[in-house]
UniProtKB/Swiss-Prot annotation:
CDD domains: ABC_cobalt_CbiO_domain1 (cd03225)
Entry GO terms, CC: ATP-binding cassette (ABC) transporter complex
Membrane topology recorded in Swiss-Prot or TrEMBL: Peripheral membrane protein
Record NCBIfam families: ECF_ATPase_1, PRK13635.1, PRK13648.1
Protein name (Swiss-Prot/TrEMBL): Energy-coupling factor transporter ATP-binding protein EcfA1
Family, as annotated: Belongs to the ABC transporter superfamily. Energy-coupling factor EcfA family.
């Protein structure tokens, strides 16, 4: 039996003055320790889901729906308990900075939890080191690059030891190299701390590395499954305005020409190896 750390059960949420729900009758589960990519076009409800998970928003009717995080059912009396379990890294890290230095910013969440200063200093130093920013501990966040700022934002979340990290379009403003560095960092942190990661993105290249993909369209769950189950559905993804990852685009073109590659070919390295093997047999 799987151990689900997050579950949505018939969740509907409508923003004030909106004529229609942002998410409608949404039900899904996320397994503990997994990496889940939540994909969809702009306005599909992705970021609304992240705010619902963290209790920043509440379902329209808690009597008809429920959100459970790490065994705690979200409600008015449990919202702070849930927020301690979930950390969000947003698209623009500048909106998250509150400290004059990197160390001050990472310490902010610990100060709110009244962590004793000697213990806090140790935690901050470790978190800053874990994200590769020890040399910038006394620097002003405003002087850092975009990738460095995201590292600091991740350190601030890591310091308070959540069970879940949500990346809410947090790599969308980075160049390809910076994006891959941040994703590699989060993968390492996930494994080292047995965290659950939710990546909210419209970048399917990023989503290709997830354990599970949830596809949202107009606030509803359109499909879900492993990347190798979702990405071959080229017409569905095109219909909702998403760009297919290169590997899957090429596999589709080859298939149309009678060359069918195995389902497990899901990244560039495997693709190149498979094509070399195919060429050697010709």
């Amino acid at each position: 039996m799987s151990d689900n750390i997050i579950s949505f059960d018939h969740v509907t949420f409508t923003y004030p003055d909106s004529p229609r729900p942002a998410v409608s009758d949404l039900s899904f589960a996320i397994e503990r320790g997994s990496w889940t990519a939540l994909i969809g076009h702009n306005g599909s409800g992705k970021s609304t889901v992240s705010k619902l998970i963290n209790g920043l928003l509440a379902p329209d009717d808690l009597d008809k729906s429920s959100i459970t995080v790490d065994g705690v059912k979200l409600g008015a009396d449990t919202v702070w308990e849930v927020r301690e379990k979930v950390g969000i890294v947003f698209q623009n890290p500048d909106n998250q900075f509150v400290g004059a230095t990197v160390s001050d910013d990472v310490a902010f969440g610990l100060e709110n939890r009244a962590v004793p200063r000697p213990e806090m200093l140790k935690i901050v130093a470790q978190a800053v080191a874990d994200v590769g920013m020890a040399d910038y501990a006394d620097s002003e966040p405003s002087n850092l690059s975009g990738g460095q700022k995201q590292r600091v934002a991740i350190a601030g979340i890591l310091a308070v030891k959540p069970q879940v990290i949500i990346l809410d379009e947090s790599t969308s403003m980075l160049d390809p190299e910076g994006k891959e560095q941040i994703l590699d960092l989060v993968r390492k942190i996930k494994e080292d701390n047995n965290l659950t990661v939710i990546s909210i993105t419209h970048d399917l290249e990023e989503a290709a590395g997830a354990d599970q993909v949830l596809v949202l369209d107009d606030g509803q769950l359109l499909d879900q499954g492993k990347p190798e189950e979702i990405f071959p559905k080229v017409e569905m993804l095109k219909r909702i305005g998403l760009d297919i990852p290169f590997v899957y685009r090429l596999k589709q073109l080859l298939k149309e020409r009678g060359i069918v590659l195995p389902d497990e070919i899901d990244d560039d390295e495997k693709l190149v190896q498979s094509l070399w093997q195919l060429n050697s047999k010709m």
